[in-house]
Amino acid sequence: VLQRWATKELTNLLDHKLPPNIHLQYQGLDLSLFSGSLKLQNVALEIHNKDTASVSTKLNLDQLDLKGLSYWQILINKNIKLGTIKLISPKVIYQPSLKAASKDSVAGSKSEKKFPAKLNSISLDHLVISDGQFTMMKKTGDSIGLSLSNLNITLDDIKSNKEIIQNKIPLKYANGTMSAENFYADISPLLDVRIGSLNLKNKTLDLKEVALKTKYSKEELSKVITSQRAYLDLKIPELSIKDFDYGFHGERFFTTITEISVNNADLLVYRDRRPPDDMRYKPLYGTLLQHLPIDLTIAKTNVVNSKIAIELLMAKASES
């Protein structure tokens, strides 16, 4: 009887009592009070922007498994304690909002974050995401800004409470691993980055088949630019980032790296000298590094067995 009542109440909650900007569909729900487990199958979730009603996030999920919910911790200690959450084959599409943040919302982001009033803490032994896909669209919504596939993530000993949630990173975890393939990022109107595979484990990030390349061919670039711009084609078969760490010093984000190793890099720089120079002020790289919006520390960089080629297309004497 209790099992049927709990299943009915949970179904009613998911079907009718979620916030109006959250739309959830699923085909199968399996709840076990005895083992503290929940399984949802063929999940489709949409989160809409409250101000525009447009869809900001879509999630399709083959299966969600939750195991090891401790009722004793909830009832006696007011803690939510979970064993394992597994997300199987999640596919996420995120659409950033075109609307700029208002002054009120920016100011509100610095206000105290609210933890569930009747709870002391939330903890999770293991979070497992397997065979995921993530796509972030550009703000205009007409093209992809970032994407990756075969995403696998594990996090252990995750926790949050009234104090931790006030931090810039509102949770803590002990160990984590991450791997993915087919990474793509549109980083500027002329450049994109592609990475064949990436793997993060024990604070070491290994990248394979890294490519930074101009979106146009040499000939096409010459047709679209109005002043001189370099054509870039950088290939790095293997790149390793060791002792990678990150966090916040107060309000400022930091990243520290003990060593970056680059093997067999091949860089081609091509410049068509026929268009006019861009005479606008352009700060040197040293100045740009001094004014980064984050604190970046790289102790050592190794570049091995690599080459750089520079090609110039000069204007003919009759054209000058």
Placement of each model-derived feature along the sequence:
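N-terminal type II signal-anchor transmembrane helix
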Residues: 1-19, 141
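Extracytoplasmic assembly/pore-lining segments of large envelope/extracellular complexes
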Residues: 307, 312-313
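Flexible beta-edge/linker motif
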Residues: 25-99, 112-140, 147, 156-211, ...
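A short secondary-structure junction signal
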Residues: 140-141, 314-315
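Flexible, surface-exposed loop regions and adjacent strand-edge segments
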Residues: 99-107, 275-281
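Short coil-to-helix leader/linker segments, especially the first N-terminal amphipathic alpha-helix
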Residues: 20-21, 281-283
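Short, intrinsically disordered, charge-balanced linker/junction segments flanking boundaries
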Residues: 316-320
